[in-house]
């Protein structure tokens, strides 16, 4: 399966039991910041934004004082899982980032999608990739 198919079929799909509800944008990005696949709606990001995210995975709490920035949007960092998941909130939407062995799985959402639904979609694919050694 291509990386784009993972984004299209596993991240940008309808949320289970909620037809028509889906993430706003999603991507799979290598830990070096290279885009493996992304939705057409995924924001253009700066290398330093991805560097900040990677630093937070290695040094949990790094982004808390400044917020998580992606594509020029600032998210307030909320509870995640140190070294494994970063979660951010902005208004009625937010972001979930799951770290795998080689990549980051990113999902961005707005209402009516809930934070829990975004977490489920992103983390499920991330866990699958981890199981595959990716």
Curated annotation (Swiss-Prot):
The modification Phosphothreonine is found at residue 114. Pfam families: Profilin. Belongs to the profilin family. PANTHER family: PROFILIN, PROFILIN-5. Binds to actin and affects the structure of the cytoskeleton. At high concentrations, profilin prevents the polymerization of actin, whereas it enhances it at low concentrations. Disulfide bonds join 13-118. A motif (Involved in PIP2 interaction) lies at residues 84-100. It is found in: Cytoplasm, Cytoskeleton. One of its GO terms (cellular component) is cytoskeleton. This is Profilin-2. PROSITE patterns: PROFILIN. The variability of the residues taking part of IgE-binding epitopes might be responsible of the difference in cross-reactivity among olive pollen cultivars, and between distantly related pollen species, leading to a variable range of allergy reactions among atopic patients. It comes from Olea europaea. Occurs in many kinds of cells as a complex with monomeric actin in a 1:1 ratio. SMART domains: PROF. Phosphorylated by MAP kinases. Coiled coil: none annotated. It comes from the Eukaryota. Keywords: Actin-binding, Allergen, Cytoplasm, Cytoskeleton, Disulfide bond, Phosphoprotein.
């Amino acid at each position: 399966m291509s990386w784009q198919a993972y984004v299209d079929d596993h991240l940008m799909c309808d949320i289970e039991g909620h037809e028509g509800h889906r993430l706003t944008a999603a991507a799979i990005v290598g830990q070096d910041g290279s885009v493996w696949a992304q939705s057409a709606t995924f924001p253009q990001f700066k290398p330093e934004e991805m560097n900040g995210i990677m630093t937070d995975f290695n040094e949990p709490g790094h982004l808390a004082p400044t917020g998580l920035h992606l594509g020029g949007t600032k998210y307030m960092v909320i509870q995640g899982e140190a070294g494994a998941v970063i979660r951010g909130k902005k208004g009625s939407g937010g972001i979930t980032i799951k770290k795998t062995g080689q990549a980051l799985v990113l999902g961005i959402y707005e209402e009516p999608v809930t934070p829990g639904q975004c977490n489920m979609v992103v983390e499920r694919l991330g866990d699958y990739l981890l199981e595959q050694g990716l």
